[in-house]
Amino acid sequence: MRLCVIGDSLDVRRYAVALVAQGHQVYWLASTETLRTLHNGAAPLTVATDILPATCQYVVPVQTYHYEGIRLMCVDQECWQHPDLHTRLFTYVCLFQRALPCAVLHTWSPWPIAYLTIYTARFLAVPAVLSYSSQLASAKLEQPFLWDWVARQVAAAIVPSPAEQERLLTLAPLSARQVQVIDPTQPHLGQTLTALYTRLGAATP
């Protein structure tokens, strides 16, 4: 299964590594700021010249690497942070999906990137998964309309504990079936995610 995980959260690496261990082809779209964190880790970063589709090479400035079996795509920090430039990032993800179709788009914080990912997945008719965090909860107050819209578009939402599940169900128009409790430290993380993605893919027309 080819998958795309999108975000700067520290949990993204853990999820991506677990999915690679299951034999999946995992692309991780992040900002160049993520490189600082990864450079401090034990695993090496190797520059990759063979993972980016030709159609994506000039849409946004991007650096590509191999990292723990993950195909890492780091977008220029300015394009990542500024919503005014997110139309280019939208185009990038659309072209990427056309060249290398992914079964699922799974996104994390920050909120503008999470919203962009869900919007793009909706446009592409690809299942979208959102891992909720306390960072995202502030959007409920700041952008309540977009918060509710995102909740109605996601195929599944992931939280780390039953307590967080209960909290999210009070904050967003989601059903208990949509909100999955997945502890990112569990030993069978890759298998759990694979089962979820497979189910979502089967439910997509």
Task: Mark where each language-model region is.
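Helix-loop-beta element that forms the nucleotide-linked donor phosphate-binding surface
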Residues: 165-185
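N-terminal subdomain of nucleotide-sugar transferases
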Residues: 1-56, 187-194, 198
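A short, histidine- and acid-enriched strand-loop-helix "catalytic/donor-clamping" loop
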Residues: 80, 126-143, 156
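Histidine-centered beta-alpha loop that forms part of the nucleotide-sugar donor binding/catalytic region
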Residues: 7-8, 110, 132-136, 183-184
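A short, charged, and often flexible helix/loop element on the N-terminal side
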Residues: 47-92, 107
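Alpha-helix capping/helix-boundary segments
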Residues: 34, 112-113, 163-165
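An aromatic- and histidine-rich active-site surface loop
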Residues: 86-91, 105-124
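A short beta-strand/loop micro-motif in the catalytic core of glycosyltransferases
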Residues: 154-162
